């Protein structure tokens, strides 16, 4: 109840997207090629998933982290900052852009999640959803991801972000999340616990590639 928790993981089906690690970058992280000689197309897989702007922690699955950082730095809201972006251009999947922002201030915590997705695979229409959670309950979290399962094309996430249990200390929670991920496809995991009283944080990074 005294800490705000963020977890972000990446999965990979192709050699190109499996060839990645998370590295710390200032107060945030970025993705980097594990073996630079095998990097084919960096455009959608090399980015900063986590950046910190004052008392706000931004977490996304693409370079929209920078769009949100720059927008909020100019006093735009999270939702306004994302209006200039849409789903990724990777036909036929049109991977949704998912984003989150955590706001810790004066002993209070709230967060919001966003998904920008095609209209059931129709790239002429972008569907935009923002979910805001004020004063979230201790021990609970919300989980949003890109796809709801396998298929061709891959079907985008639908509905509200899933209610999940958040328990244990940072090492226990990190182990639980990492061990729950598909062993073949998991690539990297980032976990951060932020003390709501003073904003201090602890971070864990797990990389399959070592």
Locate predicted features.
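Conserved short alpha-helical segments that host acidic/polar catalytic motifs at enzyme active sites
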Residues: 1-210
